[in-house]
């Protein structure tokens, strides 16, 4: 239920605050690796949507990840699913190679079958690069993101899920 409410609020935010003269939408999918401090790194993927705000340099960005379960030793597996909402500032939006910075907030849904853990809100910052492939409406992108996140356990030590995330994928431009 929390996921549905969060995604509905994100969608409403996109609709209300995304009025620009050239309404540009990017849909994208990506592969991802998240190297966390207290758990083993994990592979996953995700989907996202970003919308131009006020100028071609500023974009509102929303994304959802799906990672495989994290092995945390004798305590079993931990399932972590981040939902991000943030901004991207593109340096050279019309160039073949467009560097950008990004940052925002994340709702991190956490679950384990062996212990109780609370989901949390955290933040992230990063850099990215869009590369025009010469194919109409398609771009390749890569990102390096640092996510600060600590998950509260009911019993025992908290889990520090902070760490770097690398994303590589394709954007479809509309």
Task: Name each region found by the language model.
Residues 8-16:
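Bacterial N-terminal signal peptides
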Residues 161-174:
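Outer-membrane beta-barrel "beta-signal"
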Residues 1-4:
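Positively charged n-region of N-terminal signal peptides that target proteins for export
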Residues 34-43, 72-77, 112-118, 154-160:
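Solvent-exposed loop/turn segments connecting transmembrane beta-strands
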Residues 17-24:
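Sec/Tat signal peptide C-region and signal peptidase I cleavage site
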Residues 48-123, 131-140, 172:
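Gram-negative (and chloroplast) outer-membrane scaffold detector with strong preference
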Residues 138, 142, 147-152, 157:
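Outer-membrane beta-barrel porins/channels
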